[in-house]
């Protein structure tokens, strides 16, 4: 099964998890690049506001095409209880190209379930697996264990229902 791991990361937490997931399932890694300036305190505040208002953003054209992969795993930080504008934009653009999906998120507090539900609605696919990690978990020595469980969940779902995962 060919797998693409797509993610957006402002601070590096989601990148760390995306790299671990891609390594664990021998996947291609694609970082979404938001052209908006989200650095510093002003960028942080703008980011939360844009996420809360379900805004899209301009992203650099992806180097890989979702329709060339059997499974697309999408990762996002949770901003204002939802996905980032870059991930929203990607999921809307690739809605018809994504065959099967799995999601992961990193967060400082809560909002994983709402984030996953919004991602599901946006891309039109029910994820075959999800992984939610706190900032502390994403930086812990147990990260590989969490990721291994996520990959195992994907593999089980794929074996039970190959059409949807």
Q: Which residue ranges define each predicted feature?
A:
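Short glycine-rich anion-binding loops that position phosphate/pyrophosphate groups of nucleotides
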Residues: 77-80, 108
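Redox-cofactor binding/interface segments in oxidoreductases and associated redox assembly factors
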Residues: 74-75, 103
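Short, surface-exposed connector motifs at secondary-structure boundaries
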Residues: 1-2, 97-102
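N-terminal beta1-alpha1-beta2 submodule of the flavodoxin-like/Rossmannoid cofactor-binding fold
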Residues: 1-74, 81-92, 145-165
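Residue-level "edge-of-site" marker
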Residues: 33-35, 79, 104, 132-133
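Short, conserved loop/helix-junction motifs that constitute active-site signature segments
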Residues: 66, 92-99, 122-125
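Short, glycine-/small-residue-rich phosphate/pyrophosphate-handling segment
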Residues: 102-142
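P-loop/Walker A phosphate-binding loop and immediately adjacent motor/lid segment at beta-alpha junctions
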Residues: 13, 99-100, 106, 153
């Amino acid at each position: 099964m060919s797998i693409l791991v797509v993610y957006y990361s402002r601070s590096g937490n989601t990148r760390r998890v995306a790299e671990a997931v891609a390594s664990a399932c021998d996947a291609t890694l694609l970082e979404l690049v938001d052209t908006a300036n989200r650095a510093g305190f002003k960028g942080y505040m703008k980011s939360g506001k844009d996420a809360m208002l379900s805004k899209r953003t301009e992203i650099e054209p992806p180097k890989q095409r979702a329709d060339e992969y059997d499974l697309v795993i999408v990762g996002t930080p949770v901003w204002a209880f939802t996905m980032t504008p870059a991930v929203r934009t990607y999921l809307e653009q690739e809605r018809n190209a994504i065959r099967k999906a799995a999601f992961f998120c990193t967060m400082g507090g809560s909002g994983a379930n709402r984030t996953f539900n919004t991602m599901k609605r946006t891309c039109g696919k029910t994820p075959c697996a999800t992984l939610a990690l706190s900032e502390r978990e994403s930086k812990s020595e147990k990260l590989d264990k969490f990721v291994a469980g996520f990959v195992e969940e994907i593999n089980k779902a794929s074996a039970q229902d190959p059409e949807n995962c």
